[in-house]
């Protein structure tokens, strides 16, 4: 019996260049292509949480400031969060299409040059 899907969860510590929205967009776009998956909509990258005071941006929740990015897939989604005050990146790749988590790890390592990490690979809906 084939499972419903696969989740790869990667938490990266001491990662580099985490506040670059364009880099995050290109990272997700390239990752989707490397996994031979198809987008179901537009990639979204949001910088936050931010508020404005006297017309200038100020960070809210200082230790959680970063990017939130989402790539909707025909087969599910890729979600990434960065917390640049802590040099932390967390990535979730969920898809009902089978894929190689090592490819995700290697490309993320190449792009964000992290030092330490934690990872989990979960088979979802085993009795689907």
Outline where the language-model segments fall.
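Polybasic/polar functional segments that serve as interface/processing modules
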Residues: 1-128
């Amino acid at each position: 019996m084939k499972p419903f899907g696969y989740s790869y969860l990667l938490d990266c510590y001491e990662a580099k260049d985490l506040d670059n929205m364009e880099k995050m967009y290109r990272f997700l776009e390239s990752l989707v292509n490397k996994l031979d998956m198809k987008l179901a909509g537009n990639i979204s990258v949001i910088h936050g949480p931010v508020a404005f005071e006297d017309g200038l941006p100020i960070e809210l929740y200082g230790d959680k400031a970063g990017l939130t990015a989402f790539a909707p897939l025909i087969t599910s989604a890729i979600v990434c969060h960065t917390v640049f005050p802590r040099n932390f990146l967390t990535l979730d790749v969920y898809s009902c299409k089978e894929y190689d988590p090592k490819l995700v790890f290697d490309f993320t390592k190449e792009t964000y040059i992290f030092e330490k990490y934690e990872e989990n690979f979960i088979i979802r809906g085993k009795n689907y």
